[in-house]
Amino acid sequence: MKTIVIKRDGCKVSFDQTRISDAIKRAAEACQITDDDYCEFVAQSVSQSLAGRSNVDIREIQDAVENQLMAGEHKDIARAYIEYRHDRDVAREQRGRLTQEIRGLIEQSDVSILHENANKDSKVIPTQRDLLAGIVAKHYAKLHILPRDVVLAHERGEIHYHDLDYSPFFPMFNCMLIDLNGMLTNGFKMGNAEIEQPKSISTATAVTAQIIAQVASHIYGGTTINRIDEVLAPFVKASYDKHYKVAQEWQIADKEAYANARTEKECYDAFQSLEYEVNTLHTANGQTPFVTFGFGLGTSKEARLIQRSILENRMAGLGKNRKTAVFPKLVFAIKDGLNHKFGDPNYDIKQLALECASKRMYPDILNYDQVVKVTGSFKTPMGCRSFLGVYEENGEMLHEGRNNLGVISLNLPRIAIEAKGDEAAFWSLLDKRLELAKKALMTRIARLENVKVRVAPILYMEGACGVRLKADDSVAEIFKHGRASISLGYIGVHETINALFGTQKHVFDDETLRAKAIAIIQRLREATDQWKAETGYGFSLYSTPSENLCDRFCRLDAAEFGIIPGVTDKGYYTNSFHLDVEKKVNPYDKLDFEAPYPPLANGGFICYGEYPNLQHNLKALEDVWDYSYTRVPYYGTNTPIDECYDCGYTGEFSCTSKGFTCPRCGNHNPARVSVIRRVCGYLGSPDSRPFNAGKQEEVKRRVKHLANGQLG
């Protein structure tokens, strides 16, 4: 029987006795002993001890050599062999990727690690600790958890296994809608404290901040509170009742006016504290909690007050320089008959939201009717863009407490490059990659199958996931039957079309190319629908934000296939289905171009436009919002809101490959400027936490979406 040796990297080679004898002879030479017969005898003895074995690990062979040498007459050779093996192991480890990445973090020299996430400040110790844990977790998962073909596909850039620094090493999931109402209403335990139902809005928001921090430390994606205005409205009423009681006790003449004034002040202060709390917290993941607040549908006096408080606080800014807050991400719901048009009861709140968006870029908007049409029911996205599908429990629609288990993204441009212009080859390759992506996604599900509730009490025992399970229960059941989603992502539709059909025609300008692009996403959707039917899990199609991936996929493809005009030449791939950032079109045409995609990729999407300063032209901004209402479910507006604290300039800083600079005075000191950019679905501060090279280049190339050079 031929013996196969399994090497450290998993490769398999035929057993060769001469390699053993050569190593022993080198050890003998090192201690100046000449006895070739002895060396051959030891090698032969080791070979005989392994006879009949089909497979043997390289370490087992080396251990056998050491044992034979230690039992033999030349102890010096044994010592020399052991020292030689140790030195080789050390040298090998120093050359290994794990050690190289750890060194790159410690020495702050590996920008791919330092700038991978724009929400993580890699200069500070807590973040460095998280990044170190992530390096180790990623290394272990690749070697010991994931199938080899999945790992190789990830390494080559055929697919991307998102968040490998957390999952599958840890039994964590991606993003979620917190069941805040259930937690505040029924109480819960956090650490050593039993938390009862709050008796005021200030207490409710303080507790909410602690819930956000705890939840964000147990998951790796975004944390969303759906309809926060409606959830917290009862606690505003509780505050009003307390203030009214004080007015009665002190015999204040206009008790109602007093109670209203005190309640408005308390509500504003409560949400100011919540905003500061979110932006000063550091989770166990080494970052500010990536949290989203959905609001806008509440009609009560209390809910309206919360809506105003959220928007007014955001406009006020943070600190003495009134800096734009990056978190929470604000998502404002617009509904016809409620706040959409003049005369609607909450139209005044929409006007406040428009003002806020012009000054602070947030809120993004959710168009109620389109969200229901595309996703089956109304809900705020989890994180920046992940949407849940329809799920009923006890005959009622359920949103809160649900989550996404994770994402695997396809590199569509690479498939197109490999197809070499052959559409049939493209579709064949795509189907093969889809099978691989499904296999990778199933590993995420498998990792959670035998996990006990006790690993994350805040999620599974105290109500964040909408359940109150026991410590030794399994978590797997709450992810089945579509209660949780699990997503196939994709990137670079624009570059895919260019790779397949050339750059003579732009996809925006050619109806045939548009149809071909849509057909690709239609095929992805068919695959996820099929997987859902086969497994019972909530597979969905997700338009990947690609903050880091836009750089990584393009970099790998350029190294493999060279610089291809219109594909790998820019240094980044375009975000999901979005229009090429360099294409000069008006915002209405851009909306129409992107509108077909959210209904297909209804597990995750966002559309947005680039605009000039609109603070003095809110009507123009409202026109775009209104145009989007019947066309896309989810829309964001990017406007220039940069500030220089040296010369007082406000507007748009100059963007170069090296960073951002004040166009008036040249200031680029992160401590003396505020630069805010949409990273993908959320905002970032690239002045203090730089983007990766690909994302920086993409931001640099963005053009304004204007009608005939102007808007409005």
Model region roles, listed by residue range:
Residues 1-108, 696-703:
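Charged, amphipathic alpha-helical regulatory modules used
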Residues 3, 46-50, 291-292, 495-500, ...:
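Short, hydrophobic beta-strand segments
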Residues 16, 656, 681-682:
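Conformational switch/transducer regions in large eukaryotic molecular machines and scaffolds
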Residues 28, 271, 275, 499, ...:
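Metallocofactor- and cofactor-centric catalytic cores in central/energy metabolism, strongly enriched
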Residues 91, 98-482, 503, 510-669, ...:
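Conserved catalytic cores of very large enzyme subunits
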Residues 230, 486-499, 522, 678:
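Contiguous, well-ordered alpha-helical segments that form the cores/surfaces of helical PPI scaffolds
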Residues 666-712:
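Long insertion/accessory domains within large nucleic-acid-processing enzymes
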